[in-house]
A protein has these predicted regions:
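S-adenosyl-L-methionine/SAH cofactor-binding core of RNA-modifying enzymes
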Residues: 32, 39-98
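Short glycine-/acidic-enriched loop or helix-start segments at secondary-structure transitions
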Residues: 15-17, 81-83, 111-114, 133
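General small-molecule cofactor/ligand-binding pocket signal
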Residues: 6, 34-36
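Short glycine-rich anion-binding loops that position phosphate/pyrophosphate groups of nucleotides
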Residues: 11, 75-78, 106-108
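Conserved RecA-like P-loop NTPase ATPase core
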Residues: 5, 71, 105, 138
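N-terminal beta1-alpha1 ligand-phosphate binding loop
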Residues: 1-27
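Structured adenosyl-cofactor binding patch, chiefly the S-adenosyl-L-methionine
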Residues: 112-156
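Loop/turn-to-beta-strand initiation segments
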Residues: 2, 97-102
């Protein structure tokens, strides 16, 4: 199985990009992991939040394969500990399939169609984070999950 992080829009901060790439490199020691950036929508000033979410949703759905196991990163999703997340990852790996796709949406969340396509959604925290920061947190938590699964000393309880 491969894991992808599907992103709406670029990661603007070069320091965040450097950190994200560092964790992606580490993750590839355990599993094929890649970032799948989608272009940011242009000319959104005349779009309502719902219209913007809809257009982003269409772009997201076009980027997915029918066999992809889709997990949304969403403030309304299920919260879990790092240990719980590692167990979640293990269950996904055990379920098989070619690719597990985590999706970080745009500023107005996910369209109803994207929500229907997803198997589940995860919330990283009750706090609100920028979409830029969420990218780093997800990649780090994926790395942490694999070190937990392999019994390596990165995670401390």
């Amino acid at each position: 199985m491969n894991i992808s992080l599907l992103l709406v829009g670029p990661t603007d901060d070069p320091l965040l990009n450097q950190l994200i790439e560092g964790y992606v490199k580490r993750l590839n020691h355990y599993i094929k992991f890649d970032l799948q950036p989608l272009p940011a929508l242009k000319n959104t000033k005349n779009l309502s939040p719902e219209q913007q979410s809809q257009k982003e949703g269409e772009m997201i759905l076009r980027a997915l394969d029918p066999s992809d196991r889709v997990i949304l990163l969403d403030e309304k999703g299920k919260q879990m500990s790092s240990l719980g997340f590692s167990e979640f990852i293990q269950k996904q790996l055990n379920a098989g399939g070619k690719k597990l796709v985590f999706i970080v949406g745009g500023p107005y969340g996910f369209s109803p169609e994207v929500r229907k396509r997803a198997m589940s959604s995860i919330s990283l925290s009750a706090m609100t984070f920028s979409h830029q920061m969420v990218r780093l947190f997800v990649v780090e938590q994926c790395y942490r999950a694999f070190t937990i699964l392999k019994g390596e000393p990165y995670h401390h309880q």
